[in-house]
Design a protein with these regions (language model features):
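Active-site-proximal alpha-helix that buttresses catalytic centers in soluble enzyme cores
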Residues: 2-77
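Generic beta-sheet signal
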Residues: 3, 142-151
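Acidic, low-complexity terminal tails and accessory targeting/binding regions
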Residues: 77-78, 84-97, 136, 140-142, ...
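Phosphate-handling substructures
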Residues: 70-129, 214
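Active-site signature of alpha/beta-hydrolase-fold catalytic machinery across serine-
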Residues: 67, 155-159
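Glycine-rich phosphate-binding loop signature in dinucleotide/nucleotide-binding domains
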Residues: 43-49, 134-142
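Short beta-strand scaffold positions
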Residues: 55-56, 125, 147-148
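Active-site metal-coordination segments of metallo-dependent hydrolases
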Residues: 19-28, 114-121, 168
């Protein structure tokens, strides 16, 4: 089984809300999401098939999944277990903004640690359990495409690679991480954070004026 994990595209900032923050994509994020279907299509063919498109329930993931699901002619199946660790928080700050406006939080995440208010073990157990169920339900030659979050991708990699910290890897917007599951139970991280298809659309690679305009 091949699990293709796609991080969501760039979402907007939400600072005040009466419930959990659930931002939509920015215009730049919409453009990033449009780049994904062509990349995903290369994983289909021959004996292999893209069997399912699944997504976190959070809007930024569902909206990123939509163009790919439409291209493949598949529904987007929402799986609660793929939600990010921040799902219940009343604010959302894109990581590139947190670097400037919430430096302590940014530094903690970049050091590889979940925010202090997050129940780390519960989050990890939820993600790993959901992935195990996905793989168990698939045929050996299936590819499952999962639209999720940087934290979700990272804790799965932490478990597979035996890493100490839960947030080891930078996972870019719309980047692709591929995990292979063998019939014997072996798990292999085939690629991590593939981003060439959106390289020019990542905030760090864009002139400030262009980022402000889109």
């Amino acid at each position: 089984v091949q699990l293709v994990l796609v991080r969501h595209a760039q979402p907007g900032r939400v600072l005040t809300t009466s419930g959990p923050a659930d931002p939509e994509l920015t215009e730049l994020g919409v453009e990033q999401a449009r780049r994904v279907p062509a990349v995903i299509a290369r994983f289909a063919g021959g004996e292999h098939r893209i069997a399912r498109v699944v997504s976190s329930p959070q809007r930024r993931a569902r909206d990123t999944a939509a163009p790919t699901a439409e291209k493949l002619g598949l529904p987007v199946e929402v799986l609660d277990g793929l939600a990010e660790y921040d799902r219940d928080l009343p604010a959302y700050i894109p990581i590139e903004d947190a670097k400037r406006d919430f430096r302590a939080t940014y530094d903690r995440i970049k050091a590889g640690h979940l925010p202090e208010q997050i129940d780390g073990p519960a989050f990890v157990a939820r993600v790993l359990g959901t992935v195990s169920e996905l793989v168990a339900a698939a045929e050996p030659a299936d590819t499952v495409v999962a639209f999720a979050h940087g934290g979700v991708v990272n804790v799965l990699l932490q478990d597979i690679l035996g890493l100490e910290r839960p947030l080891t890897f930078p996972i870019d917007y719309c980047s692709i991480t591929r995990i292979l599951f063998s019939r014997s139970g072996n798990r292999t991280a085939a690629t991590i954070n593939e981003n060439s298809h959106v390289w020019d659309l990542l905030p760090r690679n864009r002139p400030a004026a262009a980022c402000d305009a889109i």
